[in-house]
């Protein structure tokens, strides 16, 4: 019997090992222990980052949100029905990124940046992180340029500036989306790029908005990010951040952008759902403790950045230009309750709010802007000069009219001054009415405000104020086109414009053609 030589055996094994061709690959892999309602628990994953992408079999991805002692809680991005217990889960070492760039303009994409409009794939290769840190104090610049919404009531009383966060708040079906969509339509020739983020909306509503933008010719400079009511809570939670990243692309390159979040109440509800499924402790109204941070870290990214920031970001490719991202978040209230948890949070984060009131809407005053409660904290410095000059008495007239109208219900005989004030208030209220999808130019708006401010409406019947305004604007655009063009270009108010407007209105009133 042949005797085995241990040294010989070890030499053979060593030789075999050396010849073995195995590419070494360090893998951080775990096992799925439970799958339910879009939440996956994974055991055995080490060194996972918060917010890291986790890959499951079949190219399904998740996002790590709960890092616990012996397991990781992740939310699945997309369809989770193919996942089952015992499957493997791998760390990717990447955080979630979405496509950015001008190629997205005119397209409808989902929360992950995948096109859903049937117009073919996106041609860009550039991506950016969904979660980003907002620019610091040093890189910011004060808001001093206007964003014209095209609404008299907003641009005159609650002006919005580039880089501002202005909240639109009100009950359901009161014209919040209409106001935001009109603001986007008004930007089609302003050079401001727009992003419309729909969160938890009906697909028919989103399709209607896209159709209106297309009809108005504003879709070409707008990106629509849609996370409809049928999408998972994870995608509804991520959509605003994805839209913000797409808007920041323009801001960081010295351009101006406007983003509408429609609406953040539904995003908070989606985040609450995710948090409760992840077994996080609930707080007030069952929202998690960090629901304020959910919105503050999103809205702080809307800002006006300095020339130095843009130059540093573009490595000197763009110089001498500031960039801005203006946010119009929308919040839906229940029966006008602005003291609920999410509304108070967002009011405290933003630079002002446009409050829409049900009673005014039902009374036919549309847009139903309550001038007494609405405020713009920084927009005054950005207001167009001519609008600022002519709108001074409008807010006061409306506030006094509200007060006197309530008082007049109880008083039988009113003195002459009070009666005149009430009549003026009625005419101004009538003048502030505006049709949907009909944003006004600066010159048209200035003309309306001039007529009210200088008392040219005093002898016009309240019921005919609207037709008077339309006829006056048509007359000026036809017979005084040069003056209107000058106002639209410069936005200044001087003696020449004052005299031109006064003479034109007097001439128009003499015709009695309204």
UniProtKB/Swiss-Prot annotation:
Domain of life the protein comes from: Bacteria
Major localization listed first in the record, in broad terms: membrane
GO cellular component: plasma membrane; proton-transporting ATP synthase complex
InterPro entries: ATP_synth_asu-like_sf, ATP_synth_asu_C, ATP_synth_asu_C_sf, ATP_synth_F1_a_nt-bd_dom, ATP_synth_F1_asu, ATPase_a/bsu_AS, ATPase_F1/V1/A1_a/bsu_N, ATPase_F1/V1/A1_a/bsu_N_sf
Ion transport in keyword set: yes
PANTHER family recorded: ATP SYNTHASE SUBUNIT ALPHA, MITOCHONDRIAL (PTHR48082:SF2)
Protein name (database record): ATP synthase subunit alpha
């Amino acid at each position: 019997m042949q005797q085995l030589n241990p040294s010989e055996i070890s030499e053979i094994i060593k030789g075999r090992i050396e010849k073995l061709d195995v590419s070494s690959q360090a893998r951080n892999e775990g096992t799925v222990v439970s799958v339910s309602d879009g939440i996956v628990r994974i055991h055995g994953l080490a060194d996972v980052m918060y917010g890291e992408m986790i890959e499951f079999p079949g190219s399904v991805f998740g996002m790590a949100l709960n890092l616990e002692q012996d397991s990781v809680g992740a939310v699945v991005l997309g369809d989770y029905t193919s996942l089952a217990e015992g499957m493997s889960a791998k760390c990717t070492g990447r955080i979630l990124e979405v496509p950015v760039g001008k190629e997205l303009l005119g397209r409808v994409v989902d929360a992950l940046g995948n096109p859903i409009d049937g117009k073919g794939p996106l041609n860009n290769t550039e991506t950016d992180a969904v979660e980003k840190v907002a620019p610091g104090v040093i890189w910011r610049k004060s808001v001093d340029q206007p964003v014209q919404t095209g609404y008299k009531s907003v641009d005159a009383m609650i002006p919005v500036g580039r880089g501002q966060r202005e909240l639109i708040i009100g009950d359901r079906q009161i014209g919040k989306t209409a106001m935001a969509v009109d603001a986007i339509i008004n930007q089609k020739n302003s050079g401001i790029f727009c992003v419309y983020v729909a969160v938890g909306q009906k697909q028919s509503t989103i399709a209607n908005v896209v159709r209106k933008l297309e009809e108005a010719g504003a879709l070409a400079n707008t990106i629509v990010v849609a996370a409809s009511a049928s999408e998972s809570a994870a995608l509804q939670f991520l959509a605003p951040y994805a839209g913000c990243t797409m808007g920041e692309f323009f801001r960081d390159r010295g351009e101006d952008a406007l983003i509408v979040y429609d609406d953040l109440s539904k995003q908070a509800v989606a985040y609450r759902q995710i948090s409760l499924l992840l077994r996080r402790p609930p707080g007030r109204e069952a929202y998690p403790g960090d629901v304020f941070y959910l919105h503050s870290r999103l809205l702080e990214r809307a800002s006006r950045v300095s020339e130095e920031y843009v130059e540093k970001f573009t490595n000197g490719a763009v110089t001498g230009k500031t960039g801005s991202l203006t946010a119009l978040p929308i919040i839906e209230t229940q029966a006008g309750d602005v003291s609920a948890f999410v509304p108070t949070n967002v009011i405290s984060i933003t630079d002002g709010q446009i409050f829409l009131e049900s009673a005014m809407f039902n009374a036919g005053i549309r847009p139903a802007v309550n001038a007494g409660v609405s405020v713009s904290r920084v927009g005054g410095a950005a207001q167009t000069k001519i609008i600022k000059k002519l709108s001074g008495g409008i807010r006061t007239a409306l506030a006094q009219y509200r007060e006197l109208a309530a008082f007049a219900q109880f008083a039988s005989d009113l003195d002459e001054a009070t009666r005149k004030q009430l009549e003026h208030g009625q005419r101004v209220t009538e003048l502030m009415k505006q049709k949907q999808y009909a944003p006004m130019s600066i010159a048209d708006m200035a003309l309306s405000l001039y007529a009210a401010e200088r008392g040219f409406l005093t002898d016009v019947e309240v019921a005919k104020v609207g037709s008077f305004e339309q006829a006056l604007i048509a007359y000026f655009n036809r017979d005084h086109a040069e003056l209107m063009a000058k106002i639209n270009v410069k936005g200044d108010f001087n003696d020449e414009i004052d005299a031109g407007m006064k003479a034109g209105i007097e001439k128009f009133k003499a015709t009695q053609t309204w």
